[in-house]
């Protein structure tokens, strides 16, 4: 669980008073389990909360954390450091860089974890998601988009410029990715 000091809670409450009613706080990790993991804090609006978020109730507000990121935020502490005339919000997350993949995990499971921890949080901002459907013997991943990504006019750019580049950087075993989604453009499509 994320621990938030009383002074940090007061700081957040002061900030939240200036936001739209129902706004809370999100604690997140970018690139969890890697040497370049970065933790952060942001506003979390009602519409941003998904079924994959876990709510931690504080005094008068809620801190949301994306469920797959919880192991990386274990024993995390948010506090305010005051030095002379300055104060700074600090987030200490000792496990953000720790890799939780078990060495003998099969490749499919590692790719699914990578998608859930690194790709899907970005896609969820647009109401979208991507799932691994198959790994071919020739080294390609077949992916299926859903939600806001289904029918989105930017899906090929997302696939090649975003997802494929990240997967190839993380997994040397693969040659590329391709989309097997039967795209149906509709109100659910982001673009």
Swiss-Prot record:
UniProt GO molecular function: 4 iron, 4 sulfur cluster binding; iron ion binding
Superkingdom in the source lineage: Bacteria
Gene: nfuA
UniProt cross-references to Pfam families, sorted A to Z: NifU
Protein name: Fe/S biogenesis protein NfuA
Ligand binding ([4Fe-4S] cluster): 149, 152
Keywords for this protein: 4Fe-4S, Iron, Iron-sulfur, Metal-binding
PANTHER family membership: FE_S BIOGENESIS PROTEIN NFUA, IRON-SULFUR CLUSTER SCAFFOLD PROTEIN NFU-RELATED
């Amino acid at each position: 669980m994320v621990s938030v000091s009383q002074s940090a809670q007061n700081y957040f409450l002061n900030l939240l008073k200036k936001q739209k009613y129902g706004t809370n706080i999100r604690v997140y990790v970018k690139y969890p389990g890697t040497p370049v993991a970065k933790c952060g804090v942001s506003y979390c609006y009602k519409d941003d909360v998904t079924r994959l978020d876990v709510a931690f109730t504080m005094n008068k507000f809620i801190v949301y954390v994306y469920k797959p990121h919880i192991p990386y935020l274990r024993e995390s502490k948010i506090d305010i450091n005051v030095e002379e005339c300055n104060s700074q919000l600090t987030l200490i997350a000792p496990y953000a860089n720790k890799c939780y993949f078990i060495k003998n995990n099969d490749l499919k499971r590692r790719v699914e974890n990578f998608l859930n921890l690194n790709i899907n949080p970005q896609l969820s901002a647009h109401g979208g998601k991507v799932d691994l459907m198959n790994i071919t013997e020739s080294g390609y991943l077949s992916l299926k988009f859903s939600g806001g990504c289904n029918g989105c006019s930017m899906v090929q750019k997302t696939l090649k410029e975003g997802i494929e580049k990240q997967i190839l950087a993380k997994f040397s075993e693969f040659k590329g990715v391709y989309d097997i989604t039967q795209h149906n453009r509709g109100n659910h499509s982001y673009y």
